[in-house]
UniProtKB/Swiss-Prot annotation:
Region (Disordered): 51-76, 239-331
Name the UniProt record assigns to this protein: GTP-binding protein RHO5
SUPFAM superfamilies per record: P-loop containing nucleoside triphosphate hydrolases
Gene: RHO5
Bridged cysteine pairs (disulfide): none
Record field: compositional bias (Low complexity): 66-75
Lipid-binding residues (covalent, S-geranylgeranyl cysteine): 328
Complex formation: Interacts with RGD2.
């Protein structure tokens, strides 16, 4: 059975210990005792076939602490994990002691109260800088491969959003609950894995907090080498498909008969004759005179040719006549 180390941090009195007790014992503590250091251990069942990307896990969260994905659906195909929960003190007196439990942590939970803006502001002003300085969150595979910190942001005391006394108190202080828009912007800007809300008093969303934390902890992102290999294979397949289609097009072009682009070969005979008749423009008067001149010139050339032929013929002489007469026989 794989063991998951989960460390919970956040301001004092935001409900970290109450969250852990509510999850492990199904009860809500009524007395507040500041935590110095405590450790809880339990077994959690996670359905097989985790999401292929952390974004899919986050999309299953309705932002109010209930997952609509595989965590809430009944399934017999589950895998057991041992989750070790490390509770820490949020007071400044323990700033030097607290980082001793950070090494080899699989997932961090940074908690804040949805009704206290000061605890929400400390997420980026105190807790994230402390983790960067005293832990190895920037050396995890999630950060090196995805640019995401192994951190789940948790809003506690979600039941106070509908509490009239808390609403009145916030109005008197000219304040309000931490809005969902503020939370989404912080998660995106800081590179957290996701966000969820819960209430230890009503146990709403408590179980889903740790199921989601385990999913993030066991998620194994694709390495850059695997991505490069997959992209290379995809490019090769695309190139091969393109070349095959190109060769096919060339063969089809070679098999097609050659067509002349001239107008005479593309137009039908009837339409070609009509087009020629339409383009046959009647000659002008000047053109008629030129035609008559050409005809007379042609006749004159024929007469001249006949005269020349007659001149070349030899005329008969007197001697020729005498020779004919001398042929007569005298009896």
């Amino acid at each position: 059975m794989r063991s998951i180390k989960c460390v919970i941090i956040g301001d004092g009195a935001v409900g970290k210990t109450s969250l852990l007790i509510s999850y492990t014992t199904n009860s809500f503590p009524t007395d507040y005792v500041p935590t110095v250091f405590d450790n809880y251990s339990t077994t959690i069942a996670i359905p097989n076939g985790t999401a292929s990307s952390p974004l899919e896990l986050d999309n299953g969260n309705d932002k109010r602490g209930s997952l609509s994905s595989a965590s809430s659906s009944p399934s017999t195909d589950r895998k057991l994990y041992k989750i070790n929960l490390w509770d820490t003190a949020g007071q400044e007196d323990y700033d030097r002691l607290r980082p001793l439990c950070y090494p080899q942590t699989d997932i961090f939970l940074i908690c804040f109260s949805v009704s206290e803006h000061a605890s929400f502001a400390n997420v980026t002003e105190k807790w994230l800088p402390e983790l960067k300085q005293t832990s190895n969150i920037e050396g995890t595979s999630l950060y090196t491969k995805l640019g995401k910190y192994p951190i789940l942001l948790v809003g506690t005391k979600s039941d106070l959003r509908d509490d009239p006394a808390t609403q009145k108190k916030l109005q008197e202080a000219n304040s309000d609950y931490v809005s969902q828009e503020e939370i989404d912007e912080l998660v995106q800007r800081c590179g957290f894995m996701g966000y969820t809300e819960c209430s230890a008093a009503t146990q709403a969303g408590v179980r889903e907090v740790f199921e989601q934390a385990v999913r993030y902890a066991i998620y194994e992102p694709e390495s850059p080498n695997q991505k490069s290999a997959n992209h290379t294979l995809t490019d090769e397949l695309t190139t091969a498909t393109t070349n095959t289609n190109g060769d096919k097009n060339i063969r089809e072009q070679k098999q097609q008969p050659h067509h002349n682009n001239s107008t005479d070969s593309t137009l039908p005979k009837g339409s070609l004759q009509q087009e020629k008749e339409a383009l046959n423009i009647k000659p002008t008067k000047k053109g008629q005179k030129d035609k008559i001149h050409e005809q007379s010139k042609s006749k004159g050339s024929k007469i001249a040719s006949n005269n020349h032929h007659n001149k070349q013929a030899k005329p008969k002489t007197r001697n020729d006549k005498k020779k004919k007469k001398s042929k007569c026989v005298i009896l």
